[in-house]
Amino acid sequence: MSSPRFTPGQAVGNRLKARGETFEDMRVGKKVLLTWTEKWAEELSGTLGATPAPRTMFIDTFWLRTVDTPEGGITVAFAPIGAPGTIMLMEDLIACGAESFVGVGASGGLDPNHPVGDVLIPNAVKILDEGTSVHYPDQGDPTGDQEMIKTLSVLIEKHGGRTASGDWWTTDGFYREMTDDIALHMENGILGIDIETSAMYRVAQYRGVTVCNILVVSDELWIEWNYGIDFSEFKTGVTAMQQAAVEWAQS
């Protein structure tokens, strides 16, 4: 049977060695809040009191901050956009002891009932238009952890957000979200779209860790493109999403 030439643990170990560090220098919490927006990563870190920790990646663009807790610590990870870089970092963190992930990000909305500012939670990814997840064993539809979905749904609403969970679409083609595809997937009940979730959910299933993404709607795709990152509703949704993520991490 064929196997990978090298493992995430070997890769991280060699990067650490090149910096004169070892795994004992790492500070990766059991719980990880992973986000692709540096401002949000800084805000989450500030709320949690997380401090800089040694990075796993060779470059210093993408960073980690960790706060120690009796339950095993919480790490905030500023991650590369897109499935390949996100999965590289996620695999690194799992090799360093991470056990549970919440992706804190943004999404495109396909459901008119959930406009800009609503926080969507992907359940099962039905449309896989990205290329990273195919490199991992197929265990059916990549699916989020059901207990985490329930918990985070309650927390988002507790903090004043509107939320929904449902079937999902993940793509590599950020600028190729075609109108015919959007119409078809809307007919089939797809709730939203992003560029990382399917790979994150599949890796979690393969590695035996838990993950749930919470993704505020930044743009509406169902008729004309409506980009809403300057809307007050978007800012309200971001606040509720972050507060829910922090409360989950501290629980």
Question: What do the PLM-derived regions correspond to, one by one?
Answer:
Residues 198-233:
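Zn-dependent metallopeptidase/amidohydrolase metal-coordination segment
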Residues 139-188:
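Active-site rim beta-loop-alpha module in soluble metabolic enzymes
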Residues 1-151:
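Metabolite-binding pocket within alpha/beta catalytic cores that recognizes anionic/polar moieties
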Residues 99-100, 191, 210:
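Short acidic/polar active-site loop segments enriched in Thr and Asp
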Residues 151-159, 203, 244-251:
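Generic non-transmembrane alpha-helical segments
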Residues 221-251:
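His/Asp/Glu-rich mid-to-C-terminal helical/loop segments that flank catalytic regions of hydrolases
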Residues 37, 108, 169-174, 199, ...:
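Glycine-rich beta-alpha junction loops
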